Amino acid sequence: MTTAQKVQPRLKERYRSEIRDALRKQFGYGNVMQIPTVTKVVVNMGVGEAARDAKLINGAVNDLALITGQKPEVRRARKSIAQFKLREGMPVGVRVTLRGDRMWEFLDRLTSIALPRIRDFRGLSPKQFDGVGSYTFGLAEQAVFHEVDVDKIDRVRGMDINVVTSAATDDEGRALLRALGFPFKEN
């Protein structure tokens, strides 16, 4: 009987072999635990129309499950807001938190396949860091991921992607994400 070998994600392997050493030299860390790494990736899809039609949330759940390979959590309204015809407990979005190997695989697919498929894409804004090295950006449609069949999309949905790093500053986070292959605009 053969034993199956666990395959490391390509981006994780590259981080451990090249990127970690380059960041250590660039910032002069004394301890290996100071070197920034990606902690988690949170993918959020807001579905405000689900307040009027509860079936719309199923399409968002299916799309996000295909894109991330993990079952999304349905997010519900915490407060009732009359102007939006929203009641407490109604579904308003779906969210997935990716960690470990799934996170590395998702980042690899995002940077090498999905972002280059965006029409008129000129790079990500380098100014969307939160002050402690984490980066948040949005995608206008889910069709840029090759897992989603364009013919089976019931409606175009955007999503927010939050890449949480262990970096202490925005410069460290920017250097890490640039080394991982995130295409930032040059000012």
From Swiss-Prot:
Cellular-component GO terms for this entry: ribonucleoprotein complex; ribosome
UniProt keyword Glycoprotein present: no
Transmembrane segments: none
Entry annotated with the keyword Zinc-finger: no
Top-level division of the source organism's lineage: Bacteria
Molecular function, one GO term: structural constituent of ribosome
GO BP annotations listed: translation
Family according to the record: Belongs to the universal ribosomal protein uL5 family.
Function: This is one of the proteins that bind and probably mediate the attachment of the 5S RNA into the large ribosomal subunit, where it forms part of the central protuberance. In the 70S ribosome it contacts protein S13 of the 30S subunit (bridge B1b), connecting the 2 subunits; this bridge is implicated in subunit movement. Contacts the P site tRNA; the 5S rRNA and some of its associated proteins might help stabilize positioning of ribosome-bound tRNAs.
UniProt name for this protein: Large ribosomal subunit protein uL5
Organism: Mycobacterium bovis (strain BCG / Tokyo 172 / ATCC 35737 / TMC 1019)
